């Protein structure tokens, strides 16, 4: 009995480590968005390219480590290469980086961090507010999706509650920063994206309710 419990715990730890390695493999290249090189001239991208090269090597190492963990556990090659949690890793990487960008923008608004352009008070890690607002507008519907996809609080697990809280906090931070960017196109994009997410979830709720009738 005790041996079975130990095996179960080892299996859970292995699965958690594999998911974490997959997340790091996805998040490291996407973290390029947060790389700034204020010491270089405007338009120079050599710093970003250097970071991207290192991130790709780190990502490859994480993928190899995850495959080895699964191989030692006796998993099939199909399971190892399926990368079943890829979409979740991408979503949560964008949410994490979107939260960092939102906090970055708030710090610039209140004068705790320097802007990326002398003409604008709010740029995040970007050179001007336009791309910054577009990035936040892209992340906001993802936050909304993760907040409402599991419904209410009563019947979900603690881990899903933590996911809802994290997505909700990042969404609120983005809502605090996005109006200050003064980018109407980003406002429209964020609004249309959120409306689309709400419509998709309403359709899924209706289909679930019809199946229970």
Regions of interest found by a model, annotated:
Residues 1-10:
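Short, Lys/Arg-rich, polar N-terminal cytosolic tail immediately upstream
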Residues 9, 15-34, 54-73, 79-118, ...:
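Alpha-helical transmembrane segments of multi-pass inner-membrane proteins
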Residues 35-43:
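Membrane-interface helix-loop junction between the first two transmembrane segments
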Residues 44-53:
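Interfacial loop-to-helix junctions that mark the boundaries of transmembrane helices
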């Amino acid at each position: 009995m005790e041996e079975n419990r130990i095996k179960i715990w080892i299996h859970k730890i292995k699965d958690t480590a594999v998911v974490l390695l997959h997340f790091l493999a996805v998040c490291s290249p996407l973290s390029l968005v947060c790389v700034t090189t204020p010491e270089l001239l405007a338009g120079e991208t050599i710093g970003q390219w250097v970071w991207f090269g290192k991130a790709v090597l780190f990502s490859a190492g994480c993928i190899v480590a995850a495959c080895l963990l699964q191989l030692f556990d006796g998993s099939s090659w199909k399971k190892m290469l399926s990368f079943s949690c890829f979409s979740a890793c991408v979503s949560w990487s964008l949410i994490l980086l979107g939260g960092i960008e939102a906090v970055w923008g708030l710090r610039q608004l209140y004068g705790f961090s320097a802007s990326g352009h002398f003409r604008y008070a709010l740029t995040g890690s970007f050179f001007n507010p336009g791309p910054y607002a577009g990035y936040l507008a892209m992340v906001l519907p993802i936050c909304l999706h993760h907040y409402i996809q599991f419904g209410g609080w009563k019947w979900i697990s603690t881990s899903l509650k933590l996911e809802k809280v994290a997505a909700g906090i990042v969404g609120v931070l983005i809502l605090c920063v996005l109006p200050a960017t003064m980018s109407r196109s980003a406002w429209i994009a964020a609004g249309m994206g959120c409306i689309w997410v709400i419509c998709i979830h309403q359709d899924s709720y209706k289909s679930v309710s019809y199946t229970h009738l």
